[in-house]
């Protein structure tokens, strides 16, 4: 026996059923849909009419909504960060770009550091948010916390600042100004 003689088990591979290809094929004429009527036509869907009974979509209440400003957030625990340090993936600093590559995230994602676990070495971590316990544990290990205000996508659009500075600069808040009247 060699690799060139390997074949799939008998009955494991079936030919695709091609319907509507003549009567001799066994699936011609009506293409497996039976005889005439609404159900044999294209575009037919089984109705959800329940015959006088209040339909399911009206019996069940409406609930919940998705906020328009919801942001995709990737969370990282201190145990994971400590493992990265021990594996040699990061040294004494973790930036947003490091988090993106280590977590396989997109440019639009936010990163939050959670305090599950312990840190064994001092490290500087840049992220968008930190839990209280994470901040305390990082400080206890001799590390520092740097908060970023923009995603990678937003920082790349800032023209007058270098990329690293744009990440850390807060976004400008819109100020509504009263219109000046043109009347004398």
Swiss-Prot record:
Assembly, per entry: Part of the 50S ribosomal subunit.
InterPro entries: Ribosomal_uL15, Ribosomal_uL15/eL18, Ribosomal_uL15/eL18_sf, Ribosomal_uL15_bac-type, Ribosomal_uL15_CS
MF GO annotations: rRNA binding; structural constituent of ribosome
Phylogenetic lineage: Bacteria, Pseudomonadati, Chlorobiota, Chlorobiia, Chlorobiales
Gene from which this protein is expressed: rplO
PANTHER family: 50S RIBOSOMAL PROTEIN L15 (PTHR12934), LARGE RIBOSOMAL SUBUNIT PROTEIN UL15M (PTHR12934:SF11)
Protein name as it appears in the record: Large ribosomal subunit protein uL15
The organism's place on the tree of life at top rank: Bacteria
Function: Binds to the 23S rRNA.
Family stated for the protein in its record: Belongs to the universal ribosomal protein uL15 family.
UniProt-listed SUPFAM superfamilies: Ribosomal proteins L15p and L18e (SSF52080)
Compositional bias ranges of the Gly residues kind: 21-35
UniProt keyword list: Ribonucleoprotein, Ribosomal protein, RNA-binding, rRNA-binding
GO BP terms in the entry: translation
GO CC, one annotated term: cytosolic large ribosomal subunit
């Amino acid at each position: 026996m060699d690799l060139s003689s390997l074949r799939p088990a008998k009955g494991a591979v079936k030919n695709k059923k091609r319907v509507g290809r003549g009567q001799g094929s066994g699936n011609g004429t009506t293409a497996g849909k039976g005889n005439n009527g609404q159900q044999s036509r294209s575009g037919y869907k089984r109705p959800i009419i329940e015959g006088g009974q209040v339909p399911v979509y009206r019996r069940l209440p409406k609930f919940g909504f998705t906020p328009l400003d919801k942001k995709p957030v990737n969370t990282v625990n201190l145990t994971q960060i400590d493992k990265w340090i021990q594996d040699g993936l990061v040294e004494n600093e973790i930036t947003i770009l490091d988090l993106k590559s280590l977590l396989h995230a997109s440019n639009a994602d936010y990163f939050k550091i959670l305090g599950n676990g312990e840190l064994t070495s001092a490290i500087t971590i840049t992220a968008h948010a930190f839990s209280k316990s994470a901040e305390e544990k990082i400080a206890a290990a001799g590390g520092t916390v740097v908060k970023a205000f923009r995603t990678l996508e937003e920082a790349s659009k800032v023209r007058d600042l270098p990329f690293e500075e744009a990440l850390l600069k807060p976004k400008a808040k819109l100020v509504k100004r009263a219109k000046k009247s043109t009347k004398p």
